[in-house]
């Protein structure tokens, strides 16, 4: 692997920093524009960067994030998540991962991606039902966003509907308007219910306008309503507090698919380089530590590398970073780092 840098203080380096910062700042509001800025950043890197030699005598820690911003790697390892909104920093392009692989490292769980489909607020949304394109319910609607987003992308092709009846829709709109939510919570919710929605006077008509199967949608609603009335257990274990009978037409299907720009379905990669759990040393294909090479954060396999749970990513990065840093710190008593420009 090689390290390339823009000449310090150059006009290209200043422009690079400006464009990269703007891409980070606008990612959540204008992702396509941010992607265009990143292309300009990569152009500067390709045409003006120069190779540098860095000699580290204790060790090297790879901690550059995952690879959600690398379309080629996503297409290769996690193609079901190509359309998701990218969550993370621009540096999450797989550079650390690829550098480790070039040194003989082994990677694992590269197909594991966490996708987040939150359907609250409004807090009453989970009282509706989430169904697939056939009209079949497939999840407990009150679960954490990553627990809902995972099967939506992995098993349902990234397509699903949130079904409400007239009463629940009215309650949801009222909450979105007057419950004191942040604008970035209330506006997408209102847009989803008012713009990205299909309406049917009956269940059969709703199925027709959405392309769902009428018998499947009716069966899903009948089973759910029975559980909401207390006549039967909920098929997916939803709590009694989150159940509400849906029987007042017209009925509405809100598009919560990955392709809906009104309600982005974010995702980040979880896999990384295999490491020794005692010190963060990167392992080769034989399970042996590669001398002087360590990894941390999403560049490495960690606690949330199979299934993300809120907070684990930050905590795991802090833990794994300290672990690797401590291992490198005690590797030798003295250290020198030599950095010099390499001729082209």
Residue ranges and their predicted role:
Residues 9-11, 15-118, 317-323:
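Glycine-rich loop(s) and the adjacent beta-strand/alpha-helix scaffold that form part
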Residues 4-8, 59-62, 66-68, 136-137, ...:
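Short, glycine-/Ser/Thr-/acidic-enriched flexible segments
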Residues 1, 127-140, 271-285:
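Active-site and channel-lining beta-strand-loop segments
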Residues 216-303, 307:
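A glycine-rich dinucleotide-binding beta-alpha-beta segment and adjacent secondary-structure elements
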Residues 97, 106-212, 216:
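An anion/pyrophosphate-binding glycine-rich loop and adjacent beta-alpha core
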Residues 284, 288-337:
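Catalytic phosphate/nucleotide-handling subdomain of diverse soluble enzymes
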Residues 113-120, 124, 146-149, 259, ...:
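Glycine-rich phosphate/pyrophosphate-binding beta-alpha loops
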